From Swiss-Prot:
Annotated Gene3D superfamilies: Anticodon-binding domain, Bira Bifunctional Protein, Domain 2, YbaK/aminoacyl-tRNA synthetase-associated domain
The reaction(s) this protein catalyses: tRNA(Pro) + L-proline + ATP = L-prolyl-tRNA(Pro) + AMP + diphosphate
Enzyme Commission number(s) from the entry: 6.1.1.15
Major enzyme class: ligase
Keyword Cell division part of the UniProt annotation: no
SUPFAM superfamilies in UniProt: Class II aaRS ABD-related, Class II aaRS and biotin synthetases, YbaK/ProRS associated domain
GO CC, alphabetical: cytosol
Parts of the chain that traverse the membrane: none
Protein name: Proline--tRNA ligase
Length: 577
């Protein structure tokens, strides 16, 4: 394509509202246009990149037996009510809902488990059809509260979602392994740094779940890695540092602690390290329309993990109780909540099990207690893993080697759902004993826009976007000084030859100076620039510069051999001989 034909626009100035680099560069380089908050027009330049990304996804999914379909975007409320997710999603305010002319409620799809389950339940005729792997690449919707992150957190976004249906847990696991490998192949082809980590299933399901994270400084998520094992910090199981505690139980003491509320204040007041103090927080657990308040005690040097609490106690939601709720249920305020004399159900982290003679609050303002012990002073609560992993914690899954902590962006998520949705929609078959058997389901998704934005976050430099070669909008930009007739003639010939060989060149035929064109090419992120400047004018040698600033000087007769080595294989053409 020629620049004069391409409908695009670059900008010198960054959008002041852009909260992340990828949003700033996508707008600046002419890839997206903001229609409204969190809603974007994908420009022709963006769509070239997206189509290449989607081609890679389709190739890898088709290779393992995936069948593409298109599911509806409008979903009847009754389908979501069947699984209990209608109210769960609406309570978060993330679901777009509407009412039709017959006064029936619908939603704009954020995900498609209900719709695909209903479809398969009507078409599945027998066990011989299993396993089934269906996928789509479609627009989805979430009413994000603060959509300031461009494609990272848009209200309307492009996503690939796969659904598998199997005759047994074993077959479901086989499908999971196939999809996991296919997703690995997709991200390997992008040549970006990513990790696969254990994750919490959230509202989707509670079976085996993993996330794919692109490593970048944006740090929307924190991930813990030890050797080949990784986990989202919300799901990471870790062994924190261990301490020795007194064997002899000392007499309990009540101590006046006026306005001593924080861990730092307690350490100073008692002249003790935080690991000898127990802190307690109250959380509100939601079960459908019912709420329950429980207290969670944890060692003073650690942070609480709301995701683990929600999972352990099988709640739909878990949040910290508000100041008003603390007064209502405990009659006290932050800083003075404790396991001693606790009027609500109490749980404690495993790290507190061996603690003796510890400091804690007793749910009375301006008072703490010293030399408190389990059993003698407080009945032992139910223990669990409620802590947030930290760098340096030991990883049980990797022989107790320490964790390293990285920042990343989640770009894909894979789940084993079991029979949660298939039971609701009676997706099943008759087994050999002619008994009705429920199918086992998996769900998988790649955020197309998020992946493209994450590539920018990881690879961009001070000159602009750096696309992976596999998805760049063009293979090479052909640049020359506007008004230089000889260079223009050579550029036109190279441009046509590249097209004939199946490559995707961009010929910048604008009547602009070379420096201007170079800056635009770098901003857009084209992997290579063929520069017809002074070197070409003086010696006839082609100057090529990669986006990573590596330079090549190539004789025109050798240029297409160079292309064969440095470009992706031409699409739809035989390799260059």
């Amino acid at each position: 394509m020629k620049t004069s034909q391409l409908f695009y626009k670059t900008s010198k100035n960054a959008n002041k509202e852009a909260a992340v680099l990828s949003y700033e560069l996508l707008e600046k380089a002419g890839y997206i246009f903001k229609t409204a908050k969190g809603i974007y027009t994908y420009t022709p330049l963006f769509w070239r990149v997206a189509l290449k990304m989607m081609d890679i996804v389709r190739e890898e999914l088709n290779a393992i037996g995936g069948q593409e379909l298109v599911l509806p975007i409008l979903h009847p409320a009754e389908l979501w009510q069947k699984t209990g997710r209608w109210e769960a999603f609406r309570s978060e305010g993330l679901l777009y809902t509407l009412t039709d002319r017959e006064d029936k409620e619908l939603c704009l799809a954020p995900t498609h488990e209900e719709v695909v389950s209903m479809f398969v339940s009507q078409w599945l005729s027998g066990r011989k059809q299993l396993p089934i792997h269906l996928y789509q690449i479609a627009t989805k919707f979430r009413d994000e509260i603060r959509p300031r992150f461009g494609l990272m957190r848009a209200r309307e976004f492009l996503m690939e979602d796969s659904y598998t249906f199997s005759d047994s847990p074993e077959q479901m696991n086989e499908q999971y392994a196939k999809l996991r490998q296919a997703y690995q192949n997709i991200f390997d082809r992008l040549e970006i740094k990513y990790v696969i980590v254990e994750a919490d299933g959230g509202k989707i399901g509670k079976g085996k779940s993993e996330e794919f994270h692109v490593l970048c400084s944006l740090g929307e998520d924190t991930i813990c890695v030890s050797g080949a094992y990784g986990a989202n910090i919300e799901a990471a199981v870790s062994q924190p540092p261990q301490y020795t505690y007194d064997k002899e139980h000392l007499p309990i003491e009540e101590v006046a602690t006026p306005d001593v509320r924080t861990m730092e204040h307690l350490q100073d007041f008692f002249s003790l390290p935080s690991h000898k103090i127990i802190k307690t927080l109250v959380v509100k657990l939601s079960y459908g329309e019912k709420d329950k308040f429980v207290a969670i005690s944890i060692r003073g040097d650690r942070q609480i993990n709301l995701t683990k609490i929600r999972s352990k106690l099988n709640a739909d939601e878990c949040i910290l109780a508000s100041d008003e709720e603390l007064q209502q249920h405990l009659g006290t305020e932050k800083g003075f909540i404790g396991p001693l004399n606790c009027p609500i159900e109490l749980y404690a982290d495993e790290t507190t099990r061996c603690m003796t003679n510890f400091i804690c609050a007793g749910n009375t303002k301006d008072k703490h207690y010293k030399n408190v012990n389990w059993d003698r002073d407080i009945p032992r609560p139910e223990y669990g893993d409620f802590l947030l992993a930290e760098a340096g914690d030991l990883c049980p899954a990797n022989g107790n080697a320490p964790y390293e902590v990285f920042e990343g962006v989640e770009v894909a998520h894979i789940f084993n759902l079991g029979t949660r949705y298939t039971e609701c929609f009676e997706v099943g078959f008759q087994n050999e004993q002619e008994e009705q058997q429920t199918c086992w389901m998996g769900t998988y998704g790649i955020g197309i826009g998020r992946t493209l934005a994450a590539c920018i976050e990881q690879l961009a430099d001070d000159r602009g976007i750096v696309w992976p070669k596999a998805i760049a909008p063009f293979d090479i930009a052909i640049l020359y000084n506007g008004g230089d007739a000889a260079s223009q003639e050579a550029a036109e010939k190279i441009y046509k030859d590249l097209q004939n060989y199946g490559y995707a060149p961009l010929l910048d035929d604008r009547n602009e100076r070379l420096g201007f064109k170079l800056k635009d090419s770098d901003l857009i992120g084209i992997p290579y620039k063929l520069i017809l400047g002074k070197t070409f004018q003086n010696s006839g040698v082609l100057e090529i510069e990669s986006r990573s600033r590596e330079k090549f000087f190539v004789e025109p007769k050798d240029f297409f051999n160079w292309c064969k080595n440095y470009f992706p294989k031409p699409r739809g053409f035989s390799p260059i001989s």
